[in-house]
From Swiss-Prot:
Pfam families: Formyl_trans_C, Formyl_trans_N. Belongs to the Fmt family. It comes from the Bacteria. This is Methionyl-tRNA formyltransferase. Its EC number is 2.1.2.9. GO terms for cellular component: cytosol. The keyword Ribonucleoprotein does not apply. One of its GO terms (molecular function) is methionyl-tRNA formyltransferase activity. It catalyses: L-methionyl-tRNA(fMet) + (6R)-10-formyltetrahydrofolate = N-formyl-L-methionyl-tRNA(fMet) + (6S)-5,6,7,8-tetrahydrofolate + H(+). Attaches a formyl group to the free amino group of methionyl-tRNA(fMet). The formyl group appears to play a dual role in the initiator identity of N-formylmethionyl-tRNA by promoting its recognition by IF2 and preventing the misappropriation of this tRNA by the elongation apparatus. Keywords: Protein biosynthesis, Transferase.
Length: 312
């Protein structure tokens, strides 16, 4: 097939690799514009643009996608289908309907669960044990189109969104190629989503990483895993931000007496922090504002205290 590909970050590159291996003709790669990144705020090109440049595939980076200009450019390339993977923009009807097979989306969840911009992060943060990828026929709604094909994937006990994303991306590439094969053969049966089962994976905000110690330890641990690498998990210690880098539910440690947020040294292991429901979180690695990352025990040794309160 002649494919016009719309995608921006590293997650989308696995789909490009899969399309290339399967012998599809990529007529263009559409990515978001280069953006400032890093401490120096130098312009950085999207991962998909780098992939395309290395192979001589034409790249488009429009600032706007709903003014008709992009639709006209793609229509001139006569693609058989548009493939969208983490492009980061909402497409209008002119784009969704310009190719004979419409627009197919590679989405990082088992729709209708986790519609929206951060499906991988929220699946992990909400403690789910299974997720997957969906190949969807796009419509004008937010991930509301018919499901064409799905593949499930287990979320490991120690998975973070960072470790899970590459596996989902690879699975998405495989599912995409299979869906295109079935589409060409006329063997796909679109399935309407059950809106009553939908959940929203909204865009993450910095404040999502703030730890509420009144939550059970398991919930705090899941959110730490889901929000790694950003926004992470953080609290405060005497007015200074304290990032919690590594922690797990402390089922085998005693819960410190007192209110949620009370922390107590567990010799040789870390800090036990009182959480909601009488549970404890065993914190093993942290980073105090203005300091490098360190073990939780080193933090306590530096404070010369065996017990203190977090969230203050």
């Amino acid at each position: 097939m002649r494919i016009a590909f719309l995608g921006t970050p590293a997650f989308a590159v696995a789909a490009l690799d899969a399309l290339e291996r399967a012998g599809h003709a990529l007529v263009t790669v559409v990515a978001q514009p280069d953006r400032p990144a890093g401490r120096g705020q130098a312009l950085r090109e999207p991962a998909t643009k780098a992939w395309a440049r290395a192979r001589g595939v034409p790249v488009l980076q429009p600032e706007k996608v709903r003014d008709g200009t992009l639709a006209a450019a793609l229509r001139a390339l006569a693609p058989d289908a548009l493939v969208v993977a983490a492009y980061g923009r909402i497409l209008g009807k002119d784009l969704l309907t310009l190719a004979p097979h419409g627009a197919l989306n590679v989405h990082g969840s088992l729709l209708p669960r986790w519609r929206g911009a951060a499906p991988i992060q929220w699946a992990v943060a909400e403690g789910e044990r299974e997720t997957g990828v969906t190949i969807m026929q796009m419509d004008e709604g937010l991930d509301t189109g018919d499901v064409l094909l799905q593949r499930a994937l287990e979320i490991g006990e120690d998975d973070t969104s960072e470790t899970l994303a590459p596996r989902l991306a690879a699975l998405g590439g495989e599912a995409l190629v299979e869906a295109l094969r079935l589409l060409e053969a006329g063997a796909l049966v679109p399935v309407r989503q059950d809106a009553a089962q939908a959940t929203l994976a909204r865009i993450l905000e910095k404040e999502d990483g703030r730890i509420a110690w009144t939550r059970p330890a398991r919930r705090i641990s899941d959110r730490l895993r889901g929000f790694t690498p950003w926004p992470g998990a953080f609290t405060t210690l005497e007015g200074r931000t304290l990032k919690v880098l590594e922690a797990r539910p402390g089922a085998d440690v005693a819960t410190p007496a007192g209110e949620p947020g009370e922390a107590e040294v567990v010799p040789g292991r870390g800090l036990a922090v009182a959480c909601g429901g009488g549970s404890a979180l065993l914190v093993t690695r942290v980073q105090l504002e203005g300091r490098p990352a360190q073990s939780a025990l080193d933090l306590a040794n530096g404070l010369r205290r065996k017990r203190f309160r977090l969230g203050t």
